[in-house]
Amino acid sequence: MNNLVKLTISQAVSGLKNKEFTATDLVTAHINQMDKYRYINSYITEIPELALQAAKKSDFLIQNNQARPIEGIPVSIKDLFCTKGILTTAASKMLQNFTPVYDATAYSKIINAGGIMLGKGNMDEFAMGSANINSYFGNVINPWKAESDDVDLTPGGSSGGSSAAVAAFMAMAALGSDTGGSVRQPASYTGTVGIKPSYGRCSRWGMIAFSCSLDQPGVITRTVEDAAIMLEIMMGYDEKDSTSLNAEVPNLRSAVNQPIKGMKIGIPYDLMENRSLSSEIITMWQNTINLLKDHGVEIVSIGLPYINYALPVYYVLSSAEASSNLARYDGVRYGLRVEGKDSNINEIYELSRSEGFGAEVKRRIMMGTYALASTNINSYYIKAQQVRRLIVNDFTNSFNKVDCILIPSAPTAAFPLNSNQDDPVTMYLNDILTIPASLAGLPCISIPAGFSANKLPLGMQVIGSRLDEYNIIKISSAIEKALNLKFIPKGF
C-alpha cells in the first residue's frame, strides 16, 4: 500500500489486522519520512533501531492474533516525559545528558497498548513557550508555508515538535503536555487535532514538572477519532500521582459521529471584541457557529466576565510554581554541573543554573520568585489564586446552561518563526484563548476549522465541563465531518 504515513490510526490498525502491510512497513515508512524532513527539527532524539525492534514484536503479536489496541502505531513522545534508558532533556542544556531509570505513566500506557516510539519530540525548554524557539536543540519549523511567501513559520509551543511531526507525517500521533495551551495552540498552527483532558485524568508521573497545578498530558493527532483512541488509552488512575483522579474512563471513541442535534453550545460573544483576535479568526468562529446551528445545535450567549484576567493570573501562578519546581536543578544531585575557581556550593549553584537554563526559563523563574517574595506574595500570588477561583466560577455558571463552549484556539494563524522573539508579552498573548480552560482544569480540544487568506490552518476550540471529554469529542467530530476539509501542508 502506498502512502502508509498518511493513514489515520484507525485505518492503520485495520490495515495491520487485515495483513495489508506489516508494522515493520509502517515504522520504516515513518523513519524514511523523518529522514526526508529532518530540517523541520521535530525530534531531539531518534531511535530507529529500537523502533524497528518493537515493530518486529508487533508483527509477531498481530500474526498470532494477540494485537493490543494500537499495535504497531508509530508515535512521537515529547521530550518532557521520562523514558527509561533513553535521553530525556526537556529541551534544556541543564538536562542534555539525563537518562531516566523509569518510564512516565502516560508514555508506558501508550507503549503497553502497542504504540511504537520513533523518538523524543522537540519542544520549548521545560515547556515554557508558545513558538518552539526556546529549545536548546534549535527551533522547530512549521511544515506549513503561507501562500504568499516561503518564510519559515512557528509550529506553536511548547509541543511544537509534536505538532510538526504529526502534520508532516513523521508520526501518527504525538504525546504532548498542556499547561496553558501547549497541545491546543500548536495543533491550531499546524492543522492538527490537539486534546487536553480534565486535570487529573492523565497521570503526571514521570512528566518533568513546570507548573504542577496546571500541567496535564495531552495528545496530537490528525483526526478527532484518532485523538479519542489515544486519549482513552492514556487516561486512568495512577497511585503514583497524588493529583490523579480515580474516575471511570469513558468510551471516547463511541462519541465520534454521534448526532449533536439539541445540544447547547455557549458562545462568549464579548470575546469577539478582543483586539488580539484577527478578523480571519472571528470569521472562522462565526462560520462554525452557523454550521452548528444548521445541525440543530442551540447557540446560547454566555458571559465569562473574568476571562480577560486569565493571562496575568496564569503567568503569576505558573511562574511561581516553576520557580519552586526548578529549584531542584542545582548542579549537585543531577543535571548540568559547572564548577568555578572556588568550587563552593553557592558558586556551583549560580554557575550551573546560569549556564544550564535558557533566557525564557530564567525570566519565568525570576517572575515567580518575585511573586512569591514575602513582600509581594499577598499582592501577586494570593490575589492570582483568588481570581483563578472567579474564573472557575465563571465556567461553572456557564456549564449550568450549556453542554460545551466554543471559542478559537489561537488569536491568529501561525506567524513567522523569528518575529516577536524579543517581545515576551506579545508571545504570551498567543495563549490568551487556551489559558482560561487550563486554569479551570477543564477538558478541551482544538480542531482545524478553516484557512487564513494565506492558506494557513486555523483552529477552533471546544471546551467541556469537568470530566466531560465525551461531549467535546462529540461536538468536534461533528464539526470535522461537516467541514470535510483536508489539512495537508503544501508539498506533503
Swiss-Prot record:
It comes from the Bacteria. The keyword ATP-binding applies. It catalyses: L-glutamyl-tRNA(Gln) + L-glutamine + ATP + H2O = L-glutaminyl-tRNA(Gln) + L-glutamate + ADP + phosphate + H(+). InterPro entries: Amidase, Amidase_CS, Amidase_dom, AS_sf, GatA. This is Glutamyl-tRNA(Gln) amidotransferase subunit A. The gene is gatA. One of its GO terms (cellular component) is glutamyl-tRNA(Gln) amidotransferase complex. Pfam families: Amidase. Its EC number is 6.3.5.7. Keywords: ATP-binding, Ligase, Nucleotide-binding, Protein biosynthesis. Heterotrimer of A, B and C subunits. One of its GO terms (molecular function) is ATP binding. The active site is at residues 78, 158, 182. Belongs to the amidase family. GatA subfamily. Allows the formation of correctly charged Gln-tRNA(Gln) through the transamidation of misacylated Glu-tRNA(Gln) in organisms which lack glutaminyl-tRNA synthetase. The reaction takes place in the presence of glutamine and ATP through an activated gamma-phospho-Glu-tRNA(Gln). GO terms for biological process: translation.
